[in-house]
Amino acid sequence: DVAEKWIAAMPATRLSVLLDEGGPVFCYSVSPQNAEWLKLPLDLQIRHMDAVSSLHTIVAANSDFAENPAQVFAAPLEYARSRGFEAAGTPWGTVLLVEVASVAQIKPYVEVWVPIK
């Protein structure tokens, strides 16, 4: 199965989320170099993300992140607007699962990029 090969290639591949025009979409991301090196099957829906100027931050996601992934883009988009920037592409992020020792649970954080102009 194609998805199993992408999952097996972690951490070179990453669970990601992008804020598409139709709403948030969970996906996997990989650099072109790693995709070639790992010979990952690319017969999926592929979106190439060009290198552009972006706002970059890490956001702590709420407990309902799996059901409401768009939440992680709200504050970075508002911050960009408040500084006079406009969105210039598809915001996206990679999901980081962090163990929080004080509460002994895994918490999702998302490293977010918001293309700006």
Model-derived segments and spans:
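A solvent-exposed interaction/effector surface
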Residues: D1-K117
